[in-house]
Regions:
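Extended, charge-rich helix/loop segments that form flexible
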Residues: 15, 115-183
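Short, solvent-exposed loop/turn segments at secondary-structure junctions
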Residues: 26-30, 65, 84-86, 110-113, ...
Length: 183
């Protein structure tokens, strides 16, 4: 009860606060040491229980309408998923249904027939690389230690951070060259 009161008071608009939109990407069946930023099913379920007890979860379309009308409940939140990974349906959806929580899924339709996003290609290329170092100096992305899950995560973060804002063609070309170097 105290936390509910405090969270309402801390909201920029008080008890009739604005909408919090919670964005998720992946929910893995089990923890992945390389993708430790992604939740596993147990972590996701704990978060959903917590959210359900401290927030009023509202479907996104209803939340937007009620926001415009000024009729949102206190501590209103909407749950969303970006990119439309298959695990959203196979892992996250059953947990959401169990807790009767609505969610909105934004699907990257360009990958419905196969293929994967450039960042996932980088992740999987580095994950599959059996070397302990990945030399990408020839494509101006440095040299990276990748002998452990921690090192692979660090390399992935650094490389994605370096190329994510490049023009699409340049980003895709570097991703292809990285894939070749990692194989």
């Amino acid at each position: 009860m105290i936390l509910r009161t405090i969270s309402g008071m801390l909201s920029p608009a008080g008890r009739n606060g604005l909408l919090s939109i919670l964005i998720f990407h992946r929910v893995l069946a089990q923890r992945d040491p390389v993708l430790d930023w992604d939740l596993d099913a147990g972590d996701f379920e704990r978060r959903m229980r917590w959210l359900k007890s401290w927030f009023n979860i509202v479907p996104l379309d209803e939340a937007v309408t009620r926001l415009a009308q000024g009729s949102l409940p206190a501590r209103a939140a909407a749950i969303t998923f970006d990119d439309g990974y298959a695990d959203n349906c196979t892992v996250a959806m059953p947990i959401l249904q169990k807790h009767k929580l609505p969610a909105c899924f934004f699907v990257a339709t360009g990958f419905l027939d196969g293929g994967r996003m450039w960042n996932d290609t980088i992740i999987e290329s580095i994950r599959a690389c059996r070397d302990t170092h990945l030399d990408l100096a020839a494509i101006d992305l440095g040299t990276h230690a990748i002998g452990s899950a921690t090192e692979k995560r660090a390399a992935i973060d650094t490389i994605i951070g370096r190329i994510k804002y490049l023009p699409v063609n340049e980003r895709l070309a570097l991703t292809e060259k990285l894939t070749e170097a990692a194989s």
